């Protein structure tokens, strides 16, 4: 049976908890729902942390957001997926997504920094077992990478579905953290002869390179030119 879906619209703000209130630079934290969604929707790779055999493990993997829920891609042979499906309580995890927006070069080595946006999600991940929800989750994962791609590709067959696993993680315990702005040098360092400022960092897409075996007459999809 498919799990009840969480709300599709973000809350005005997520409620802070002991785990989502930062111990340093608390002024950079935000619980704004729209900001959290925007940071998640812009990313491609999340880092999923959990405990395996008493030791911490962090794995990079693809993810997608559907409403107030994240779907995380994996293989049925991977340890976290097996652990999440082992018992009903699921797998306690911590998931992060980070964007680097600028390199902040100060006059002093100590005050170098980066401008960034990040989201941290705490919760319990569960393996998706409902076939309909699994197909929807896999479509969402494909469309998260390139919007519109799932409708322009062959759907997964039975064998591929059996080899693919998906984790579900609801956005209940969530926080964002970000740094914006320029250099924070000490007043006595301002006259030093060292360049200081911010180097912006941006994501840029190159020209698509067609596969050598592309069927004749296959044109470049509009959703790629729109990237």
What are these regions (language model features)?
Residues 14-71, 81-82:
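An N-terminal domain-cap segment
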Residues 50-52, 106-111, 154-156:
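Catalytic micro-motifs at enzyme active sites that drive phosphoryl/nucleotidyl and oxygen chemistry
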